[in-house]
UniProtKB/Swiss-Prot annotation:
PANTHER family: 4-HYDROXY-3-METHYLBUT-2-EN-1-YL DIPHOSPHATE SYNTHASE (PTHR30454), 4-HYDROXY-3-METHYLBUT-2-EN-1-YL DIPHOSPHATE SYNTHASE (FERREDOXIN), CHLOROPLASTIC (PTHR30454:SF0). This is 4-hydroxy-3-methylbut-2-en-1-yl diphosphate synthase (flavodoxin). The keyword Transferase does not apply. The gene is ispG. Belongs to the IspG family. It catalyses: (2E)-4-hydroxy-3-methylbut-2-enyl diphosphate + oxidized [flavodoxin] + H2O + 2 H(+) = 2-C-methyl-D-erythritol 2,4-cyclic diphosphate + reduced [flavodoxin]. Converts 2C-methyl-D-erythritol 2,4-cyclodiphosphate (ME-2,4cPP) into 1-hydroxy-2-methyl-2-(E)-butenyl 4-diphosphate. Disulfide bonds: none annotated.
Length: 357
């Protein structure tokens, strides 16, 4: 299957390019109160080290807005302010923030949106039209209900509103809490405009449910060439949002980065403590940003075949096993020594690639 990404306009959020030929960026949103400057910066730094590209923050009132100005001055990542109901907060924040997300369903009148556009245009920052199936404008929900038809009408109405005011630094999201409807919404909007898309499933739930829903919806869209930036929404799991998003990009084959771990599900042939080994390997390799395929297999049935396609591999046997690199056996050791040697080979593989670059 040939991957061909839909060519969109390119915009800029801080120092991050979105759309065009730019890599697909990964976003998250803080769950602190924005007025908690120290707590917000702590979460931003966690996301930075987890591999996030952009962070969004809620802004409920002027206390949040003033705090956001100080947070922005100290943040290692571009910041987007998330505005609902009070358009004046977007106008105030525009001069020091990297982007604004508005919800057309609750930002208020056309005049309110015009004021936000004027501020963003003067400050040269983009706007995300964040259409959400749970908060569609009344004029569209009355006619179409709260389904995909209403979302499309809302998106196109607001795109035209911004364009009529000569504003084109736009990205769009079409979020629902249902994977199938999310796919439909983005697919139907894609031929109608060339603005970059922010992908996501809203209110996706806790780690398990969010991972399943997001993998289905975002993976499906990415494989069809749709999507320029993305967030895996997950209740209370900052680093996991980034980890799952990067895994979706990696395992869909759309954007390679980090470690791809191949490991067997275990069966009655296992004669080693594979579960402990894989947990150690996962923990010790999660910091790696280089695209790397590693294999941890519990017996010889598939181990050697998988090892041929892996950069570094372990093939466990009874009380012993093999460490394999690029299909060649580099060590035969007793079980207690295998994981340490394997991890050493992984680190050496990463270093060798850095040197080549």
């Amino acid at each position: 299957m040939e991957y061909k990404r839909f060519k969109t306009r390119q915009i800029k959020v801080g120092n991050v390019l979105i759309g065009g030929d730019a890599p697909i960026s990964v976003q998250s949103m803080l769950f602190t109160k924005t007025r908690d400057i120290e707590g917000s910066l702590e979460q931003i730094n966690r996301l930075y080290f987890a591999g996030a590209n952009i962070v969004r923050l809620a802004c409920l009132d002027m206390a949040d807005a003033r705090a956001l100005k100080e947070i922005k001055a100290k943040s290692p990542l571009p910041l987007i302010v998330d505005i609902h109901f009070n358009h004046n907060l977007a106008v105030y924040c525009a001069e020091f923030i990297d982007g604004v997300r508005i919800n057309p369903g609750n930002i208020g009148s056309k005049e309110n949106i015009k004021e936000v556009i004027k501020a963003c245009k003067e400050c040269n920052i983009p706007i995300r039209i964040g259409v959400n199936h749970g908060s569609i404008e009344k004029q569209f929900s009355d006619k179409f209900g709260y389904g995909v038809d209403a979302m499309l009408e809302s998106a196109m109405y607001n795109i035209k509103l911004l364009e009529d005011l000569d504003f084109f630094d736009i990205k769009i999201s079409m979020k629902t809490s249902d994977a199938q409807k999310t796919i439909e919404a983005y697919e139907r909007l894609r031929p109608l405009c060339d603005y970059p898309f922010h992908l996501g499933v809203t209110e996706a739930g806790t780690k398990f449910h969010s991972t399943v829903k997001s993998s289905i919806a975002l993976g499906n869209l990415l494989l069809k060439g749709i999507g320029d930036t993305m967030r895996v929404s997950m209740t209370g799991e900052l680093e996991e949002e980034i980890r799952v998003a990067r895994a979706i990009l990696q395992d869909s084959g759309v954007q390679k980065s980090g470690v791809n771990i191949i490991s067997c599900p275990t069966c009655g042939r296992i004669q080693s403590d594979l579960l402990s080994a894989i947990k150690i390997v996962e923990e010790k390799t999660k910091h790696i940003k280089e695209p790397l395929n590693i294999s941890v297999m519990g017996c010889v049935v598939n181990a050697l075949g998988e090892a041929k396609g892996a950069d570094v591999a372990i093939a466990f046997g009874k009380n012993q096993g093999l460490v394999i690199r690029h299909g060649e056996v580099v060590a035969k050791l007793k079980e207690s020594e295998l994981v340490d040697r394997f991890l050493a080979e992984v680190e050496d593989e990463v270093k060798s690639r850095v040197v080549k670059e």
